[in-house]
Amino acid sequence: METDLHTVIRSNILEPIHKQFVMYQLLKALKFIHSAGIVHRDLKPSNILINSDACIKICDFGLARSVISLTGKDIIMTDYVATRWYRAPEVLLGSTKYNSQADMWSVGCIFGELLNGKPMFPGTSTLNQLNKILEVTGKPNKEDILSIQSELTQNMVENINIIKQKNLKTLFPKATAIELDLLGRLLQFNPNKRINVLEALEHPYVADFHEQYADSEIQCEKPIQIHISDNTKYTVKEYKQKLFDDLLKRKKEVRKKIMNMNMKINTNTNTHKNYINNNNNQQQPQQTLKVKKKKVISKYGK
């Protein structure tokens, strides 16, 4: 890939159709990632590679986490993730129970940057970042606060004084109604009210691409199982050993599958051969009788 989205946005060379295509591809990629039970946790323009055809690839999965094998009681996340400007409210507020909806907030921040050419929430600290977010989303109600699942939420929100909520239309005067609708659905303080990736792909903003390339939108057949605990910090040597052990285990599993397949093929081949031989043995006498019968008829016919 030639460059990244951060550089392209700063260059101000993207046409509206390019922005739509970039957003569609981003959602399409996240559809697969989230279906695998993976949360990227560090989505931002500099982690989206792009070429001259406006084709993108998501990179840097260094902070990605698996959430499939964890139970409801597990503390699944640390709050130190992602560049601050693209962090979801639940991450900023120290929640340890957030999910793939945190990625969707980051998508909203990226979308806003595509539309306006500059970051939406360039906070200088966690509190300042939260203040900038609430200026757009408005102060959360009790339901929204409970959805964050963090004891810090109530106190931090109460310490922020919002003079006047900013309207998206005012912030994005050139944006269309459809663009503002998608942006508003992505930038919901409450993660339960935030649009998910499947819903976003159905949104009118990317509808044309979604209809055209629907067959290429794939989901992971089954969630990715991580055999190394995400909640344990290992040394480099330990990581190497665990990865090596996992590779050996997978290699043995693949060999076993191949052996089973070969056994089935051999069994089916032998069965087929026996079937043909049995049929041939049964049919040969009938063919001989027919020939003799023809000879007899021919003889008396003279």
Predicted regions and their residues:
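C-terminal lobe substrate-recognition/regulatory segment of protein kinase catalytic domains
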Residues: P140-G184
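Conserved catalytic-loop aspartate of Hanks-type protein kinases
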Residues: D103
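Activation segment signature within eukaryotic-like protein kinase domains
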Residues: V22-M23
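Catalytic-loop of the protein kinase fold
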Residues: H34-N51
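C-terminal intrinsically disordered, low-complexity extensions immediately downstream
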Residues: Q212-N262, V296
